[in-house]
Amino acid sequence: MSVKHFLNTQDWSRPELDALLDQARAFKQSKLGDQLKGKAVALVFFNPSMRTRTSFELGTFQLGGHAVVLQPGKDAWPIEFDLGTVMDGDTEEHIAEVAKVLARYADILAVRAFPKFVDWQVDRQDRVLQAFAKYSPVPVINMETITHPCQELAHILALQEHFGTTDLRGKKYVLTWTYHPKIGRAHV
């Protein structure tokens, strides 16, 4: 059986996404549950986060699980992503090992890794997230790389609640966000 990762919404069917939204609605009603009882979630942050980290840590706890936060290069060894690289520089671990080792400890891996915003041809490969998915035998959740599928679902749920319907066809809205200096300077 293949592992079902949540890397982007395009990999999931409409009925699967609708089922996730239905489950999110149910979670909002009850606040606490045991769906993750006895489960561990490894949250791997290559970039800072406030809302996403808080949401995932508290969400894991509220569903009965335990989250561990790792920040490669800060409180965990830096990770190498290129195959065949001699590991004599800044990186101490290779993704092929890291993903498998973390999967022995955790039931789910969640990854946040922004692209470099230098070369779109490189960034669009989403190498960090794709490497975790390639080597992990447990599900990988994208906490934001070049896409933010969990935030996409949160937006859809908010719009459905605002409009009072799950059918958003023909509904008009404005989506805006705060300027991010790193992304704002990108040539993508």
Task: Walk through the language-model features, giving the residues of each.
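Positively charged, low-complexity intrinsically disordered leader regions
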Residues: 1-54, 58
